[in-house]
Amino acid sequence: MSEDKMDLYLQQGMYGPLETKPDERHLFLGSLRERVVLALTKGQVLRSKPYKEAEHELKNSHNVTLLINGELQYQSYSSYIQMASRYGVPFKIVSDLQFHTPLGIVIAADIAVNRELIYIQDDIYNRSVLKS
């Protein structure tokens, strides 16, 4: 085994396997942009009424997972967990204290769906840091 391969092998043993697109994975709560069906900012999740678009995607999309930002308070996303449970969609609370993301909830598919529009672009979104 060459020295470069040995070094790579040792690094992966100590730090884990290499990760593809780490910045993208940090933004989308562990998923990739190509798999995102819908993404809500933290501010949108804090809205008193859940988005109908989120319920529509949870109800009608197949093989998706609801990813929730662990920095949020439970009461802000509990209605989304209830929706996911109602439609048999698994959910994960992602708590990565090392990286911060402006997103609060991501509905992600198991495979690439390549949706062009993944954000609900309302007033709350327009005030967020994601606005282009």
From Swiss-Prot:
It comes from the Bacteria. InterPro entries: DUF1694, Ribosomal_eL30-like_sf. SUPFAM superfamilies: YueI-like. It holds the Pfam family DUF1694. This is Uncharacterized protein YueI. It comes from Bacillus subtilis (strain 168).
